[in-house]
Every structure is written in structure tokens, then in C-alpha cells.
From Swiss-Prot:
Keywords: Cell inner membrane, Cell membrane, Membrane, Transmembrane, Transmembrane helix, Transport
Further comment: Part of an operon that comprises bigR, blh, XF_0764 and XF_0765.
Official protein name in the record: Probable transporter XF_0766
Entries under Pfam families matching the protein: Sulf_transp
Keyword Metal-binding carried by entry: no
Any one Gene Ontology cellular component term annotated for this protein: plasma membrane
Amino acid sequence: MSEYWYPILGGILLGLSTVMLLLLNGRIAGISGIVGRLLQGGNPAQDIPFVVGLVLGPLVFSVIFDRFPSVTVAATWPTIIVAGLLVGLGTRMSAGCTSGHGIAGIARHSPRSIVATAIFLISGMATATFMGVYQ
């Protein structure tokens, strides 16, 4: 399989899982909302399988395709922790995360999600440019 098919297959599976979660459970596939409900003692019977699938999905992929991408993170642990906290803060401020707004929200033609996703993308490009990623 060509390396270009992996992102296409991933997008198809993301879309399929989003539609299935909405149709079968009436829930939006926003990871921050799902994890938030779990941490607040929500209904684990509906949310745990989705989170487990997020963790096991890449492992199943690596077994099936005999490929597991190597990831190198050059940042220090304090930087990673601060970045994670900032992402969490931004998620709360925007009433959702990239998966909730970018995948489920745009698919539902939500104006709030379209604006939020545009801001996510612009902020990401600005940050990458500021950090010198494009040099």
C-alpha cells in the first residue's frame, strides 16, 4: 500500500467512527468532551469503548500493516506539560477540541465549529511560523 493511502484510510475511519458514534449513541465525537465526562463520573459504558478504541487503534494498525511510526519529541517535559495545559485551556475556552469542532462540528455545518476550526488552523500556522518550523 502506498504511503499516501494511510492518511486517506485514516480520514475514512475517523469519519466512519464519528458517524457511528452519532447515529448509535447520539454523541458527538469530541475527545475533550468524552474524556471530560469520564473524569466527571459520567456514563462510562458509552465513553470508555471509544477511548479504548483510540488507544488500541494505532496498535491494531501497526500489527496489521507491520508498521509503527517512530515519533521524536525534541521538547523538554516542562515544555510538554505547559503546552498540554495551554491546549486544555484553549479547549475549554473554545467549547471543544479539534476533533469535536473540526470533524463532527463541520460535518454538522455548525458555524461555531467552522470559526473555531479556522482559528485552530490559523493559530497553528502562526505558531509553526513563529517557532521556525518552515525554515
